[in-house]
Amino acid sequence: RVTISLSPLVPKPGTPFQWHPMEEVKSLKKKFSRVRKALGKLPHLKMSFGSPHEAYLQTYLSRGDRSVHEFFKTYLSNGHDAKSALAKHSVDLFVYRQYGKEDYLPWDIVDHGYRNGFLWDDYQRGLMAGRTPVCDTATCHVCGIC
């Protein structure tokens, strides 16, 4: 028996993909549907898919700025209905925005201990399906953490 699990990319601060937008929910649903159709009838295959809507919410909460507190106020006052709270607030900017290298990121006020230049280079490698060399903490100080 083989299990395939697919989940949407949730770009998060402090990672090389912090500059990357989340893929549109509609597009993710179509892709997951195509995979289901292509592989769904294979014997001994189990598939699971992460929720694009949950990924959207996670992306907003991780990439949002101070205005996220308004979302939470709405969410807490409406019976914990995330869908209607998201609809009330303009959050697409935080979810679908492609940031550039020189853009100010809402989470830049937090000192993560690394240099953004290192993460940017790693992001560029990732876009090209490149690999990041193994870190030898005894000799390497590229990221700025060690």
Residue ranges and their predicted role:
Residues 11-12, 19, 107-112:
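Generic structural "secondary-structure junction" signal
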Residues 32-146:
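Radical SAM enzyme core and accessory elements
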Residues 1-3, 45:
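Residue-level recognition of the N-termini of beta-strands and the immediately preceding loop/turn
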